Amino acid sequence: GFDVVFVCEGGAFEELTRLFERRGAPVRDSSDDDLRFRFLVPVGRTVDDPTIDSSSFAATAWFQRRWDAIGPTLTHGLRLKPWPRTEQRIADAVAAAGLAAAGWERRRAVVLLLGPGARNGGDLTSDEAVRFLVALRVPLFVWSIGKSPSPETWDAATAIRTAADFDVAVARLRADLRRQRILWVEGAHLPQAVALTPLAKGVRLAR
């Protein structure tokens, strides 16, 4: 199966809602993939405790739907209240999404949706969040939503300016996840302690 966690920055949510309001009928997905996806909002609530300092993020339940339902679920199926853009803990939320995606023995990914005015106000930097996901072996995809790129220092390899662009990005995400394979390694090992030898031809660790 496939598990995908989307971190949706506020500006990206507004841009996608606008794009999907004026789109035509999407191409129907006839696949029978076992897909689950959820959305996480990068606004954290810090919990101070004598022994621990942690942050929680608003997240939806897992949706078990087709690939073509991702965009409509986000833009029409959720009731999200506006939140201050200056309080977005984007990198922190990406790290939390990585933990959520890695929680099950399934093919997985985190997708960060960035709008034009995205600003990170969290404790982690983008580089620190990326390194954390690499250690977890969770691939990260960054999609830039709208005509202007985000000023944040994420490697947004995918630009989305129309609803059709979103469909193409989802198709590429699905193709990448379908290439993932899960191997069981005997014993108890930290993910970052597992490495490939030169004999592993045509194989790379997910990151």
Language-model features: locations:
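Scaffold/interface architecture of coatomer-like assemblies
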Residues: 1-207
